């Protein structure tokens, strides 16, 4: 009997571990709240101009310092290369599958950065692998190509100029345990990796999330600009913050195990 009691005492370690994990999640929750508040504070600051000189200050390895600019609003203008892109997803919004469309943006000095133009729902005819925005862009360029051929211009315009208001993006996101590994060679991007995407599209490792864009064009296209779900001021949606549920889970488990321990310890013979 003494052996049983001694063995059951070892059970005490499990509720202690669960309590420790719950406490660790409390600290994680507090840390995440500070990150979110810092992002909110940055979003409230006046937008800064994302000039060529700003980009040059972060050339090379110093792009690692961009974390202090994450969630700062910026305004810029440049040439969006419509026919070059990566699709990040699929991501579900309001029960609909879609992708974020990320294209190169070329500034006046030729520097290229990444521009996340926003989320677009997938088309059923593509087996939900291509967003509507890509189909719309193809229609726009096909129309421009036909107009150019009528005017004796055999080249299709595959870029357009925009004024853009956006937010400096984080450079990487951690997916869940079930998120597949990115496969750039197959064009499959399941989680954000700005460095790898920059290599794929030959840009600097800097990405802007578009909040608003206005086309600069003296001869507007006869077709409307593709509709994207843009980024807004809802900063919290950019953070994976489930620490409160983890806190509840671990503390509940700890309390249950403590209850089992003390209840059955009293029943064991001395």
Curated annotation (Swiss-Prot):
Annotated membrane topology: Multi-pass membrane protein
Q: Report the transmembrane regions from the record.
A: 7-29, 246-265
Q: Which family does it belong to?
A: Belongs to the SURF1 family.
Predominant location:
mitochondrion
Which locations, inside or outside the cell, does it occupy? Mitochondrion inner membrane
Q: Which InterPro entries does the record match to this protein?
A: Surf1/Shy1, Surf1/Surf4
Signal peptide stretch: none
Q: What is the protein name stated in its UniProt record? A: SURF1-like protein
User: Could you tell me the keywords of this UniProt record?
Assistant: Membrane, Mitochondrion, Mitochondrion inner membrane, Transmembrane, Transmembrane helix
**Record's PROSITE patterns?**
SURF1
Key word Mitochondrion present: yes
What's the stated role of this polypeptide? Probably involved in the biogenesis of the COX complex.
Q: Which GO terms describe its cellular component?
A: mitochondrial inner membrane
């Amino acid at each position: 009997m003494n052996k049983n009691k001694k063995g059951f005492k070892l059970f005490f370690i499990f509720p202690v571990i669960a309590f420790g994990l719950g406490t660790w999640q409390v600290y994680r929750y507090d840390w995440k709240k500070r990150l979110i508040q810092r992002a909110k504070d940055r979003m409230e600051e006046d937008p800064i101009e994302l000039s060529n000189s700003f980009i040059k200050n972060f050339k090379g390895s110093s792009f690692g310092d961009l974390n202090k600019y994450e969630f700062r609003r910026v305004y810029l203008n440049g040439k969006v290369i419509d026919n070059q892109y990566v699709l990040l997803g699929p991501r579900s919004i309001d029960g609909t599958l879609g992708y974020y469309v990320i294209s190169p943006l070329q500034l006046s000095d030729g520097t290229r950065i990444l521009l996340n133009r926003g989320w677009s729902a997938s088309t059923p005819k593509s087996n939900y692998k291509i967003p509507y925005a890509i189909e719309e862009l193809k229609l726009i360029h096909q129309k421009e190509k036909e107009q150019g051929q009528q005017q004796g211009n055999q080249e299709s315009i595959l870029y357009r100029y925009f004024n853009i208001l956006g937010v400096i993006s984080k450079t990487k996101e951690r997916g869940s345990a079930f998120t597949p590994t990115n496969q750039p060679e197959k064009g499959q991007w399941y989680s954000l990796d700005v460095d790898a995407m920059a290599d794929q599209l030959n840009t600097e490792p800097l990405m802007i999330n578009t909040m608003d864009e206005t086309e600069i064009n003296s001869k507007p296209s006869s077709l409307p600009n593709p509709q994207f779900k843009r980024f807004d001021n809802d900063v919290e949606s950019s953070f994976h913050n489930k620490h409160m549920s983890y806190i509840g889970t671990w503390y509940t488990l700890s309390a249950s195990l403590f209850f089992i321990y003390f209840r059955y310890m009293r029943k064991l013979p001395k």
